[in-house]
Amino acid sequence: SGMILVIISFILFIKVINFKNRDHLSEIKFLIIILCFTITLKPFYLINIPLILLLLLYDKTRNVFLNLFFSKTFWYCLSLIFFIIIYTFINSGCLFFPLVFTCFENLPWSVDFKSINDVKIWFELWSKAGASPNFVVENKSFYVSDLNCISNLIDQYFFNKVSDFLLGLLLLLIILAIVFKNSFGKRVKKDVSFIYLYILLVCFLLEWFFNHPTLRYGGYHLVFLSIFIPFSIYLNQLNIDFKTFERKAVILIFVT
């Protein structure tokens, strides 16, 4: 799943920017490869490209990242992304289907703008609970514009799928809190840098909420990361006995 790969990318990013006195070249290469492969699954995941660019904000990763511009890994990944864009263009006349502003209507094989816009509205309508196998709202364009979908989205989608997902995450947090309860209060000073990453994550969440607020369209991993990154940073500050942790981790895996 692309969402799992994005979660791995975020974890790897946190590792890269917080581990000192290490050569991050191989890890940054791995991060680029993961994101590149994710994009090949769905071009929608191009939105995660800024995650790589964040490396330019950190002194210890900036030079390593810039040096990768001349590496085979970077150019292979760039070529693969370019191939995906060209493939979409050849099939639809759009660089990023169904974004109308990336489409060329005057090409012989191009899909007309009206059809492309209808597809875009339908995708957005479905993701905002405005359509189902046995239901479609009457005024589609009005429904997907601004926040007109909120009341119906909460009624039709939030209180059965999103609420269940949030309760599942809450249960997992409670289980982890019980597992590590003996370590609470035993804090160790550790500087963990993640503020830029979390700002980017919030931007991703806002884009998801306003354009396609369905868990299956990028919501699962964004909600999960927004909750568990701060919790993981807090756990990182605790003085944890890792031998005891290993035993508890095995028990936790069997329980879940």
Task: Annotate the PLM regions.
Residues 27-43, 47-54, 82, 93, ...:
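Membrane-interface alpha helices of multi-pass inner-membrane proteins
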Residues 58, 71-163:
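Membrane-lumen/periplasm interface segments of specific transmembrane helices
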Residues 142-190:
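Hydrophobic, aromatic-rich transmembrane alpha-helices
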Residues 24-28, 73, 186-200, 217, ...:
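Membrane-interfacial loop-to-transmembrane alpha-helix junctions, especially the N-terminal start
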Residues 15-37, 75:
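Short hydrophobic alpha-helices at membrane interfaces in multi-pass membrane enzymes
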Residues 33-34, 64-89, 247-255:
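Hydrophobic alpha-helical membrane-interfacial segments at the cytosolic entry of transmembrane helices
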